[in-house]
Structure formats: structure tokens, C-alpha cells
Curated annotation (Swiss-Prot):
<dbReference type="InterPro" id="IPR016147">
    <property type="entry name" value="Pili_assmbl_chaperone_N"/>
</dbReference>
<comment type="function">
    <text>Part of the elfADCG-ycbUVF fimbrial operon, which promotes adhesion of bacteria to different abiotic surfaces. Could be required for the biogenesis of the ElfA fimbriae.</text>
</comment>
<dbReference type="InterPro" id="IPR001829">
    <property type="entry name" value="Pili_assmbl_chaperone_bac"/>
</dbReference>
<keyword id="KW-0393">Immunoglobulin domain</keyword>
<keyword id="KW-0574">Periplasm</keyword>
<keyword id="KW-0732">Signal</keyword>
<dbReference type="InterPro" id="IPR013783">
    <property type="entry name" value="Ig-like_fold"/>
</dbReference>
<dbReference type="Pfam" id="PF02753">
    <property type="entry name" value="PapD_C"/>
</dbReference>
<dbReference type="GO" id="GO:0044183">
    <property type="term" value="F:protein folding chaperone"/>
</dbReference>
<dbReference type="InterPro" id="IPR050643">
    <property type="entry name" value="Periplasmic_pilus_chap"/>
</dbReference>
<dbReference type="InterPro" id="IPR036316">
    <property type="entry name" value="Pili_assmbl_chap_C_dom_sf"/>
</dbReference>
<comment type="similarity">
    <text>Belongs to the periplasmic pilus chaperone family.</text>
</comment>
<dbReference type="Pfam" id="PF00345">
    <property type="entry name" value="PapD_N"/>
</dbReference>
<dbReference type="InterPro" id="IPR016148">
    <property type="entry name" value="Pili_assmbl_chaperone_C"/>
</dbReference>
<dbReference type="GO" id="GO:0071555">
    <property type="term" value="P:cell wall organization"/>
</dbReference>
<keyword id="KW-0143">Chaperone</keyword>
<protein>
    <recommendedName>
        <fullName>Probable fimbrial chaperone protein ElfD</fullName>
    </recommendedName>
</protein>
Length: 233
């Protein structure tokens, strides 16, 4: 799914629109697409890579990339090369991401975000105005330590659910970040939610829910949904 939030400023001489999007080769007709919807950086790897594609037939883009922490601050613990480059029409390039920070938690994943901003070349109109549309794609980056007790594929079935009069609590006893999709409580659709390792999330019982039973899917390392599961108590 591709979602965008538009932040725009219009002036007499310049229209600047900043779009913040999540995409995987999802640029459509002319634009910038990424080769993944999420990245996994396994402990011990020297670097990982992310493909960037310009699907426009005639517009070059200036590409700038960085890694952010969950509180939306740039992380100094990662280097991305090249950090700034021009991506010509109908071309691709690889971003190489290297971790250079201090050791991270050994018993669980650590979450970061990879941000890729694309600014097209300027188009001048006859009346002298300039139109610029900049896109910013942000995807999750999971740093995964060695030696976790079991692989990610076994984690979704380990979620546990408890209920009270008007609340349902989903607990994640695993060392992985788990994103719940196609989430239903009592047969009613609930907004997707990511639960951190060894954490829990409380959902209000949806109006009209038949009961407090929970069914869900999750997202794997490749951005695909896993089979549906019934949450156990």
C-alpha cells in the first residue's frame, strides 16, 4: 500500500510540494521508487543495499538519503553512500548502508528508518514561475542481532491476547518488531499496528464486535503478508 501525506507551500513565484511516501518500485509513470518496503541489517554484515529507480523518461532527480531514529532525528550511527547524487531518467542506483555505531541490544531488534528524498530538476514556465515536486520515501530499517532464540517466521504465532470488559491486549513476547495487518477483533477490522519486542498494545473493543477474538496477519522481511492466525490467550 502506498500512502502519502502532502505538505504544501504556494508563493507567487514558486509552488513547492513535499510528499512523504512509502513505496517499493511504486513510482508509477515517472517518479522515484525503492526496491524494498523494509530493510533488515543483520549483525555481522558489513553493509546492506537499497535499490533506487527513476522511472521518469525525461526528468533527472537529485537523491539525498539518511537514516533516522524513531524520534525522527538523523542517526550518526549509519553511513549511506552515495549520500547525494543525481539519478538520470530511466536509471537505477544502489544505496549502500553501513552501521558504524556502538554495539546495540543483543536480545532484541532495534528500529531505525531509512529516508530517501528526491528533488526533480526545475521546470520553468513561460511566465517565469517554477514548479518543484519533492518526494520523500521512508521505510523501516531493523537492526537484528545474532543468536536470537528463533527466526522471525516463528514469532507471529507467539503473540498472546487477553481481554477485559472493553479492551483487548496483544502481547509480543518475542525479540522482533511485529507489524499486525488484516487485524480483526470480534470480526471488526482494526487499524494495523506494530508492536515492539517484549511489549504489548491495548486495543479498544470495536463497536459491534461479536466477541474479543483476534485474528491477524503480519509482515515478513520481504514486505509480504503471512498467513492468518488466531491469537491465543
Amino acid at each position: 500500500m502506498k500512502t502519502c501525506i502532502t505538505k504544501g507551500i504556494v508563493t507567487v513565484s514558486l509552488t513547492a510540494i513535499l510528499l512523504s511516501c512509502s513505496s517499493a518500485w511504486a513510482a508509477g509513470k515517472g517518479g522515484i521508487g525503492l526496491a524494498a518496503t523494509r530493510l533488515v541489517y543483520s549483525e555481522g554484515e558489513e553493509q546492506i543495499s537499497l535499490g533506487v529507480r527513476n522511472t521518469s523518461p525525461d526528468v533527472p532527480y537529485l537523491i539525498q538519503s539518511w537514516v533516522m531514529t524513531p524520534d525522527n532525528k538523523k542517526s550518526a550511527d549509519f553511513i549511506i553512500t552515495p549520500p547525494l547524487f543525481v539519478l538520470n531518467p530511466a536509471n537505477e542506483n544502489l544505496l549502500r548502508i553501513m552501521y558504524i555505531g556502538a554495539p546495540l541490544a543483543k536480545d532484541r531488534e532495534t528500529l531505525f528508518f531509512t529516508s530517501v528524498r528526491a528533488v526533480p530538476s526545475t521546470t520553468k514556465r513561460k511566465e517565469g514561475n517554477t514548479l518543484k515536486i519533492a518526494t520523500q520515501s521512508v521505510i523501516k530499517l531493523f537492526w537484528r542481532p545474532k543468536g536470537l532464540a528463533y527466526p522471525l517466521g516463528e514469532a507471529p504465532a507467539k503473540l498472546r491476547c487477553t481481554s477485559s470488559a472493553d479492551m483487548v491486549t496483544v502481547s509480543n513476547p518475542t525479540p522482533y518488531f511485529i507489524t499486525l495487518t488484516d487485524l480483526k477483533i470480534g470480526g471488526k477490522v482494526v487499524k494495523n499496528q506494530m508492536i515492539s519486542p517484549f511489549d504489548k498494545y491495548q486495543f479498544s473493543l470495536p463497536k459491534g464486535a461479536k466477541n474479543s477474538s483476534v485474528t491477524y496477519r503480519t509482515i515478513n522481511d520481504y514486505g509480504a503478508e503471512t498467513p492468518q492466525l488466531n491469537c491465543k490467550s
